A protein has these predicted regions:
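A short, structured surface patch at a secondary-structure boundary
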Residues: 137-140, 145-238, 244-250
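Extracytoplasmic substrate-binding proteins
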Residues: 222, 239, 243-246, 253-337, ...
Length: 467
């Protein structure tokens, strides 16, 4: 029985090798050099009612799909192969013949999405495209971590009965998503800005999340803490069965996490908002969340409002500041090292748009650089205002780090401000959560700090003056 079944199947493959779009991957099987056999074709899995029947398709289309429905067939196939060494060479030849027609299918499938759905005005790390024949859209994410070089990832969003094209190298979800896991607090803020935060069922580090909905629903189990980085609770994730996990990368892809998510069959996508140098570019990533929730128009309207308020305030500050710009120092030492951001960073952009002048101009790279303490002290001494001073809540806490700080003019003049006005008991700052999506509010705060005469309010939202 096994012999007849597998022989017929093999003959079918061999006879149709010039018209089949299949790929055979072979590795170390006992006695014939094979332990793994993967078959791929454009035919949908449910078409395989007979394990020995293969669908003829154009040889060059080369769209790759793995079919679990023919696992039994493959097992049968191996049984006969193990006693038929003479087929080993033939299989190797077949593999080489077929491989020549398999290149580029994923690229071609992605290229089918030619309809412009959303092209960001400020962000550089993503775009959204569609295709004429259905409502599916493709989110393309580029270089979502430092040093990515030329990384490109795709998320295919299906809706209204659309089908995933065979061979597309993409994670696939159906919209609207119902259950999302957010690995960054800024992801939570994106859904909240759209009024869609109820779709979040999991977060990373729930004690550091400021969002009201998340905190109200954590104790009843509707929002779970899935853990951190490589210490993710995969057992919990598997039981939750989320539609999508939103990841972030710092220096590269976390292959341990992505590999396990693939194993569990949980779709994921990297969100690269933190890589954007423009404050509005960071906020514009909310359009990805809007696409996932089927609220594209609302997302566009929300972002347009944020951008309009930001740009209007920026223009007013530019007109009021004249030639006088307060010099601004950033950060405090970390383990005897003072990290100063690039003059291209989003924080420096905010300072400049708010009418300030960043004191450190040597770094024009895309990362922060370490500055020795003596140089940093001289920079702080030249500043009119000092902001983002780590965990400090009072001037006493700041000067306790280094008694010399008491002589810095910004300290003696009470011009030290920190971005931790809105903070969780565990120390999570809403500045790095909702502030990422509301740069208009951050700009208003900084305008109040640097140029109170140009501000439309004296009240601070994310910042507070250290006393």
């Amino acid at each position: 029985m096994y012999h007849l079944c597998t022989t017929a199947a093999f003959q079918t493959i061999y006879q149709k090798r010039k018209i089949l779009d299949i790929q055979l991957n072979i590795k170390d099987f006992p006695s014939v050099g094979v332990t793994r056999f993967e078959l791929a074709t454009t035919r949908p899995p449910d078409a395989y009612s007979n394990r020995a029947e293969l669908h003829p398709v154009a040889f060059r289309s080369a769209n790759i799909v793995y079919f679990s429905q023919i696992v039994t067939f493959l097992q049968d196939f191996f049984l006969i192969l193990s006693s038929m060494k003479r087929f080993a060479l033939l299989i190797a030849v077949l593999t080489g013949l077929l491989a020549s027609g398999c290149g580029g299918s994923a690229t071609r499938s992605a290229a089918d999405f030619t309809v412009e759905i959303y092209t960001p005005e400020y962000a550089s790390g993503f775009d959204i495209r569609g295709r004429d024949k259905d409502a599916a859209t493709l989110v393309t994410v580029r270089n979502p971590w430092q040093g990515a070089g030329n990384v490109e990832q795709h998320l295919l969003i299906l809706r209204e009965g659309a089908k995933a094209p065979a061979g597309l190298d993409a994670q696939v979800v159906k919209a609207p998503v119902r259950h999302v896991v957010c690995m960054s607090s800024s992801h939570v803020a994106m859904f909240d800005a759209l009024g869609e935060v109820r779709r979040i069922s999991g977060v990373s580090g729930i004690d550091y999340i400021s969002n009201t909905y998340v905190n109200e629903h954590r104790y009843c189990g509707e929002v779970r803490d899935v853990g951190y980085d490589t210490n993710l609770n995969f057992e919990l994730l598997a039981s939750m069965r989320p539609d999508l996990v939103l990841l972030y990368g710092v220096t590269g892809e976390n292959t341990v996490v992505t590999g396990k998510l693939r194993e569990l069959g949980i779709p994921y996508i990297y969100i690269g908002d933190y890589m954007e140098e423009s404050p509005l570019g960071k906020a514009e990533w909310l359009m990805v969340a809007a696409e996932l929730c089927n609220v594209r128009d609302k997302g566009a309207e929300t972002f347009r409002g944020i951008a309009a308020r930001y740009n209007a305030l920026k223009a007013r500050i530019a007109g009021a500041a004249g030639g006088s710009r307060p010099k601004v120092m950033l950060n405090t030492p970390y383990r005897d090292t003072w990290f100063m951001p690039s003059s291209r960073s989003f924080m420096v952009r905010l300072i400049e748009d708010a009418g300030g002048e960043y004191v450190y101009t040597k770094n024009a790279s895309d990362t922060s650089v370490a500055v020795d303490l003596e140089e940093a002290y001289l920079l702080a001494s030249s500043a009119d205002t000092w902001i983002n001073v780590g965990p400090c809540n009072t001037l006493a806490e700041l000067t306790a780090q280094n008694p010399k700080f008491a002589d810095v003019p910004a300290v003696s003049n009470r011009q030290v401000f920190n971005n931790n006005r809105r903070q969780t008991p565990a120390g999570g700052s809403d500045f790095w959560e909702s502030g990422v999506i509301r740069p208009d509010l951050v700009l208003r705060d900084l305008c109040t700090v640097f140029n109170p005469q140009a501000a439309d309010t004296a009240e601070l939202y994310y910042y507070k003056r250290l006393e």
